[in-house]
Amino acid sequence: MTKQQIEDDAISAFNIIQNGGIGVLPMDIGYSLIGGSSDSLMHIFETKGRTSGKLNAFVGDLTSADELLNLTPESRELLHLLTKTYDLPLGAIAPCNLNHPLLKTLDSRTRRMSVKAGTIVLLVNAGPFHAAISRLSRQAGYLLIGSSANLSNSGTKFRVTDIEPEI
């Protein structure tokens, strides 16, 4: 795919998610099932057969990570080293700034499903599509949240043809 095709697909997916839909999104770490509303997240949980004790992850870039995560200077340097210098994807689990305007937009149900003891998971640097949709999310001030595109406990899917029909 060309960079323009990736950008166009990211815009289409973001618009669907922002309007209450759910996207099956290609990431370097496998396909993800992403929503942005409480209802879409509930639908993801029900479709996957996910237990309520499992939390969602947020989708974001390094700028989002710098704003949302409360990291020590050493931890922030390590995050940048791994994702920017070594170009590795990372699910950063860290305390977050619950007073950040984006996190304050979460309703109580979404917060219960995505934040535990002031900590979130933020997926950073998971490929070109992830970069494009993360940028759109940050620019629009609209959080993207979800998990892997599979039935619960069935393993990550790296090919769209391996995603279960229920998903």
Predicted regions and their residues:
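Active-site-adjacent structural elements in enzyme catalytic cores
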Residues: 1-167
